[in-house]
């Protein structure tokens, strides 16, 4: 019985170690040399969300209202590292574990002139709890994570409008 309990505890610890979030990756890498890091807190999102409309223009000059999504965000984490650094190698391995450990779905991948961009989401059919954007261009590796409780339909509509 003691062996079974020990085995179960070890399995739980192993699963927890691989189930990192954008916040945990940010905390792990943001203070390392050669890492550029940006964090936006829930308080900042609440403050921005009180503005009447937060708009951006798409390529056709049409306004896209971001307020419905901003109000649902709980964190923004960005890490940018030189792709040839040891931090980049380690970060890429941790991002791979994150994407493999949760049920992330690849929304799109774009490759152009040596640059690769991938966008992933995690959540259920109605809500998105995490949106991750990864970019590699041969010089830098960029990891961006938006976390919150985003309505999937609203997010997809905003992404479609912004992509026009």
Q: What are these regions, as identified by a protein language model?
A:
Residues 152-164:
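A recognition module on extended beta-rich or small alphabeta surfaces enriched in W/G with H and D/E
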Residues 22-84:
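Early exported N-terminus immediately downstream of N-terminal targeting peptides
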Residues 1-25:
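Bacterial Sec-dependent N-terminal signal peptides
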Residues 20-23, 92-98, 106, 125-126, ...:
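Mature, folded catalytic cores of secreted/periplasmic enzymes
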